[in-house]
């Protein structure tokens, strides 16, 4: 049996798959006490099933996405060590940023020592400005992290309560600005993510579940839950990835469609082309900043069923913030869910309270509760439709999209919009009509994210670095390094070695799958030249087991 759990800002969903069928599902409200929500969802989904029958648990969450979209995280200060090159004006990240002298070259050799006094000044200034979270990032720190470690050690010595993140621990790829953003967001979200992981582990333990536990990454692959605390930002689009895989599993093989997952806090958009989710070639983008996170081409729009709706003068405005449940369920403010209740498009909550909420918006403008509800719903529909149109201009620039157009021998946008999530039934028909497309709401749409998590193939990664001149290789995920005495070590040998380590990690985490096809995420080769002679090579290889789903779920709940 497999369990899929999706922890959203509004609801926590769980599904139990038994021999390829959806045996049970549950949807409960996400409470402040996350542990109680997880236990309630597990109890409803398992319905007396013994925990020792569970073979695997996969989670997804919009927790990190919602934190960032709503900007509900503590500010993060930056200490950057960029070395020579770009003007410092290029390093603007809308937060307190201190640049100190020091530099490593691309081989990891120190070319400019740290200036201790300027380091001390930056640390003191950040503390004086009230920063309790600090990201320390140096260019080429993935090749030599000594400068980052020195600054971080001094920070922790002076201010033991300060949360410090270092760039080399977050991302091994080169590209300094992306590593800065990735490290900054990791620092901003770590505390709440660790609370999430602790709650999950406690809930599973209380229900006697001792199976391997994974969490969905932004690219639709998985990560062992204990390992995910090292890089919480990898789960930044975990929720959107889950809804995409859920739609992939709930629609016929080979379908092309736009995915619209309308939750309580956000609406997630994605694209499936001929049965395969579209991958973002440049990585996850947050507030127009690119990160090192490999992700599906998704976007989280800050509008959902629980978004605050307010009258400002003669206008009704939807804010990108959630203050709690809808007014009809005891919440403090009117929301789109209240509008749906008034229009008879949902049965959630108390109808009288929903009418009261819409009347508070509409009466000063001379509108009836029904007219105000229509106005609110149209605002939601227009916002989401406009974001889909905007996303199409980005999707159409993706290399994979262009290849799909060539293979399909046609240049037109997908004509099917698949709605999932709690708000899909109320909005998706009008959104599809606005786009001139056909609306589809598949079976199990309200718990599609949990299904997407449950059917996700477990994946593992290996990041291999080989330096034939210095005579060593290392496996980043295992913290392993070993001597290598083959000066003629080839790229193919490096790929074979990475695949071998994938097999070792699969055994370690109890994955009963053969490592045959390997997905190459990154392969880079650098020649070392001295006195016009090649003296060695550096290989950076990043591979993972293939992403995908176990199969497609039919209307009867069985996997086909």
Range-by-range predicted roles:
Residues 1-560:
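N-terminally biased helix-coil "hinge/interface" segments that flank
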